[in-house]
């Protein structure tokens, strides 16, 4: 069965999704000329869902009713694998912008689509770059528009969670936005960092109660709280 699926993945699913990805990027680029909030989200949402379906990956969502669609949030999630992106894009159910590395914009077509969609490009190399990132975020995060961040900064190599960087929590506290921890479980088994081969399976997104901004909170405290909450819903062999 593994060999049959591998033939299906590389000879059928991957070529279809390559074409679909280019079409989605082009639709996003053109659509964002007219309405960035709509065309920067919905084409990619359905692209991500189709990507999961065609690769026989099921996404189960728990706790999404905790989210108010009129509120802007900072969503933070652990980063198990590439399918975290498809799971969040397709099944978050809330319009958002990614906080992503600026280098992604160098990818032909896809990079242009990300820029046109208004995703927040992170440049941490200079103080001015950080100020520009915060200014861009401030312009976007209102009226229910949210942001999604992987605080680890990269996919795990082992399945275990890495340390959290503070950027997302600094942003949340500075702008007074609630932070929503999301536990992603199953993505590492579907496609870990070390391979491009997909293993069909189930990914679970678990939404936790929003953590409201409090003036007494510091960045390290909120970061630690979110990491603890996210980790508690992971299997024991995925905890550090």
Model-assigned labels for residue ranges:
Residues 51-52, 114, 140, 172:
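A generic structural signal for well-ordered alpha-helical segments
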Residues 1-29, 42, 65-67, 221-240:
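Membrane-interfacial terminal anchoring regions of lipid-handling membrane enzymes
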Residues 49, 86, 169-170:
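Active-site phosphate/pyrophosphate- and oxyanion-stabilizing loops and adjacent acidic/basic residues
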Residues 17, 21-25, 108-115, 198, ...:
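Generic alpha-helical secondary structure signal
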Residues 24-45, 53-56, 62, 68-127:
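Catalytic core of membrane glycerolipid acyltransferases/transacylases, capturing the structured
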Residues 4, 131-240:
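Non-catalytic C-terminal accessory region of glycerolipid acyltransferases
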